[in-house]
Amino acid sequence: MLNPPLNQLTAKVNSKYLIATTAAKRARELDERRETALLDQYQSAKPVGKALEEIADGKIEPVVPKEYLG
């Protein structure tokens, strides 16, 4: 089961694609230890789970270039 739940994630970001790409990018950063942890405590031990928790908590948001906004 996905933790945090998908409906909690889509409440913050309305696109599953943006959730996936943002989480993947952040997970790579966490895995490479470039960034420090944004939450005091994580439920997940894996970088992707940690990234999803950060998205659900509103600590990170996707960045969409202006040319893609229409």
Swiss-Prot record:
Belongs to the RNA polymerase subunit omega family. This is DNA-directed RNA polymerase subunit omega. InterPro entries: DNA-dir_RNA_pol_omega, Pol_omega/Rpo6/RPB6, RPB6/omega-like_sf. It comes from Staphylococcus epidermidis (strain ATCC 35984 / DSM 28319 / BCRC 17069 / CCUG 31568 / BM 3577 / RP62A). It comes from the Bacteria. One of its GO terms (molecular function) is DNA binding. Its EC number is 2.7.7.6. One of its GO terms (cellular component) is DNA-directed RNA polymerase complex. Keywords: DNA-directed RNA polymerase, Nucleotidyltransferase, Transcription, Transferase. SUPFAM superfamilies: RPB6/omega subunit-like. Promotes RNA polymerase assembly. Latches the N- and C-terminal regions of the beta' subunit thereby facilitating its interaction with the beta and alpha subunits. Disulfide bonds: none annotated.
